[in-house]
Amino acid sequence: MKFTKMQGIGNDYVYVNCFEEKVEDPAALAKFVSDRHFGIGSDGLILIKPSKNADFTMDMYNADGSQGEMCGNGIRCVAKYVYDKGLTDQQQISIETLAGIKYLDLTVEDGKVVLVRVDMGEPELIAEKIPVIADSEKVINEPIEIDGTNYHMTCVSMGNPHCVVFMDDVENFEIEKTGPLFENYKNFPRRINTEFVKVIDEYTLQMRVWERGSGETFACGTGACATAVAAVLNGHCNGEILIHLLGGDLKIEWDKETNHVFMTGPAAISFEGEINL
């Protein structure tokens, strides 16, 4: 099977062109290729497929084999793949995901995609639709106790569930210990992605993420979008927000007129190869 390893600010996936390759068991393949010792090494697997409703379909799986609804960094890499490989010559494309159809604008230099702006759609704030079990209709700056420590969380869905927690120090935070406790907390029926965020100023945030099914990753595009929405809802930020992640920076804008969130960031090919299955 031929594959391409790609990354969006360090959030790395193995990409398979399903116009040419056939994948029988994507969940098992995701677990195998994601293993950084016995496989290729990645945060998961993304299959690029035909679509009846859009230009392409993105089918994503986490490192543990669970299927994900949407990946912001991954969808930018899909856009780069299909353009750079000649599957399209359009600089405005649509990609179908389990979280709906996303629309992307490609910035091309010397025939290659260098930057992608994604319309990530509308944030979902209604608790039962995220889903979060809560007493209130929305979960904004609500208290939560994890392992004897009190936090405040804001919950947002960007097609997948996110819990955003603002704190003073994210660099020294024990995410390997606390991340799984948030992910599997009883009030999150489909588990949850958790962002731990420091406010630098009204235009800038620093973020670490514990991804459902993958653990800590270098970046999470949907998480950055959820974080930007949470920052605005909590009065920390407004307008276009620059978010510093472990792997690099993303620009996020929540357009209040359309209620759509836009994400801009890079995408890169790491290497290509062939693997015997």
What does each model-found stretch correspond to?
Residues 1-112, 163-277:
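A glycine-rich beta-to-alpha transition motif near the start of alpha/beta enzyme domains, typified by
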Residues 105, 119, 131, 143-145, ...:
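Generic structural detector for well-ordered beta-strands
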Residues 124-152:
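Active-site glycine-rich loop that binds ribose-phosphate moieties when present
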Residues 115-123:
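Membrane helix-loop-helix hairpins that form the core translocation module of multi-pass transporters
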Residues 117, 152-155:
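Active-site-proximal beta-strand elements of phosphoester/diester hydrolases
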